Amino acid sequence: MGVIQTLDGLMNNPTPEGRVDDILRPEGDNPLLEKGFVTTSVDALLNWARTGSMWPMTFGLACCAVEMMHAGAARLDLDRYGVVFRPSPRQSDVMIVAGTLVNKMAPALRKVYDQMPDPKWVISMGSCANGGGYYHYSYSVVRGCDRVVPVDVYVPGCPPTAEALVYGILQLQKKIWRTQTIAR
């Protein structure tokens, strides 16, 4: 059944036979789908929009930040994934923590996280951000940024390559796609 036939059928019969309850039926029994209507949930629509427009707040603390800049450069070009780096936490929905988090910087990290609008996600990039890394036994290092902010995706490596960060961003997009946004 083509679009023209569907429009022609609607013009001849302006009141469709389907009711609101027809949306809840399985796809095979749904008369709205047979007439050419597409139904979706608000969750799926919002998650689709969020996966295509992730705006990360960069929180580069050490050498991993260089790889994060490399991922945004021309060779990998995160713009084609809808990732645009933002300088302000109020404009971003993703925070990339890249590098060694020390005790003095932990309150600043939490403050930036609290300033981000909901829903918000965090990517922990590198061994130092994941668990302290090389400086794990130092008295001044936080042993993982997940002790300060909730982390959604961990990117391993010392430093992780830019390709690993892109893979982590793609994994976060998959996680956002599966999230129930309204119930979150």
From Swiss-Prot:
It is an enzyme of class 7 (translocase). The keyword Coiled coil does not apply. Its cofactor is [4Fe-4S] cluster. Belongs to the complex I 20 kDa subunit family. One of its GO terms (cellular component) is plasma membrane. Binds 1 [4Fe-4S] cluster. NCBIfam families: nuoB_fam, PRK06411.1. NDH-1 is composed of 14 different subunits. Subunits NuoB, C, D, E, F, and G constitute the peripheral sector of the complex. InterPro entries: NADH_UbQ_OxRdtase-like_20kDa, NADH_UQ_OxRdtase_20Kd_su. Keywords: 4Fe-4S, Cell membrane, Iron, Iron-sulfur, Membrane, Metal-binding, NAD, Quinone, Translocase, Transport, Ubiquinone. The gene is nuoB. This is NADH-quinone oxidoreductase subunit B. One of its GO terms (molecular function) is NADH:ubiquinone reductase (non-electrogenic) activity. It is found in: Cell membrane. The lineage of its organism: Bacteria, Pseudomonadati, Pseudomonadota, Gammaproteobacteria, Lysobacterales.
